[in-house]
Amino acid sequence: MVVATVSESRGTLSYDSGRVSGVTADITPDKAPLRTWLPGFVALAAIWGSSFLFIKVGVAELHPVQLTLYRVVAGALTLLVVLAVLRDRLPREPRVWAHLSVVAAFGVAVPFTLFGYGEQRVESMLAGIWNATTPLIVLPLAVLVFRTERLTVRRAVGLGLGFLGVLVVLGVWEGIGGAHFIGQLMCFGAAACYGVAIPYQKRFVAASAHSGLSLSAAQLLIAALQLAIVAPFVAGAPPLPTDLSPKVVASVLTLGALGTGLAFVINMRNIRVAGASTASTVTYLIPIFAVLIGAVALDERLNWHQPVGALIVLLGVAVSQGVFGRRRPRPVIGVGAPAAPAAEPASR
């Protein structure tokens, strides 16, 4: 799902000011102590990294479209409960719902399904690696199509490195074709869908006054409707929960309730406490957890060029996002708490 993590605003976030040396100090999130955000940061990476394991387990008994439908329904119900507890509400403007229908298709329904199809053919850890290529799609679309970003030399170099990494992950020198290669293309296609959804959301949805929770809940509701319409024609009648093994039922519930619901709450807290810039770096940990979990839980193995390519991809993403040249702001001494940095959506 496309959720707030990097630089796109989906609601105003703030944090409490503290006292330093007898004066009121507005400690910026980027200066927050590690102990206040690191546990949630690692937990979020583990939750999103484990999603690829649960997809792999789920598609063993469910059609990818059915798995996605069940997952999205579980996630929507979870966020609706959180929405009710926090006394927030869904958007009411037809224009917002119209734009969210596009985000729901490209940020939820299609990519979730493509990852399911892909993991019928490739390892879960490899799907996790492909998920990290999303920023490589976001940048050219944001520059050329949606015109929400500007291409710089640094970004161009990062983009080139990233796509070099993609070729290494694919192992193009070994030949193109076969089910495994097609599965990788499906996973890359899923990441490409996120790449469409993120700049589209930034262009048409981010300026709305609704909270990130409200927009995400609406997004999942729309995606559930889209999938419910398509599923009978593509996958036939869905099996009853009693026809599924306990591990598949648990995987579906975990994907929806934990991977979407709880993960969203954790992510919003990470942004509030640590700042959007720090919270966005969870992108680099997700494939690491995906690989570790796939190796331990499913005894999966990678070819040598796949982790090497993944490192090149992550390096390219880091260069394009200016991670190596980023400077943290200093604490501001004064009265009142400034608004936290805005957040950009990321895919899981």
Residue ranges and their predicted role:
Residues 20, 79, 101, 141, ...:
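Hydrophobic transmembrane alpha-helices of multi-pass small-molecule transport proteins
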Residues 36-45, 83-84, 89-116, 159, ...:
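Loop-to-transmembrane-helix transition segments
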Residues 1-69, 117, 176-203, 225-226, ...:
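Glycine-/small-residue-enriched transmembrane alpha-helix faces in small-molecule transporters
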Residues 69-70, 108, 127-133, 200-225, ...:
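Helix-helix packing/entry segments at the starts of transmembrane helices
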Residues 78-90, 135-157, 288-308:
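C-terminal transmembrane-helix exit sites in multi-pass transporters
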